[in-house]
């Protein structure tokens, strides 16, 4: 598995470029609360961006979305008003001539692709649990994204990580999982040994859906973009015939990527959360 850790912003930008629906902007001089000036990438005599979406990719307007209402010389006018743009501000334009896709479409498609990949692949992880293990309680709450576990360890006073043995059935000495309750129980002498110590779980997790632009995705970015592009083109078949050929290409590319992401599980792996 390629752990590329691409941010939500990087995936959105890459997907928009993949769909040939993106113009990258960088302000060459100060603008205003409703204008963006780019002497390099904006040329009104060559292309009008009226009706496109402008998506700001740097502070102070990071993540803001506006609609282009005018293109004049090297200047784009947009609404609603935001913080004044300054030299070096960056943004992308999407929804090409009203026939492309909006930023919210790209976000939904990327998260849809992640959900599809989660049905096929999981991500190796080590999750440290807080607070420390309490033998009187006898259980650990499984982290929300963790799906499977194969090894439990506690850290002793010397800083060494020692394995908690696996129990073949509930009530036996060692650890067992209750997926329906999303807990791992440690019983008997192993529980006494781990009492009061930090515990960590080796296992496999699901990729969380992305929300903040800084959120990251550990799945192969090429596969996620291909799957998201497939979802977008499939949804737009009745809008533009050009997507008919693209949808087949992206479906094949995404399926190949998903097949590469399958992880060989440790033989001790147990499901810990349904």
PLM features per residue range, with description:
Residues 1-65, 69, 75-83, 90-274:
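Glycine-enriched, solvent-exposed interface loops adjoining structured elements
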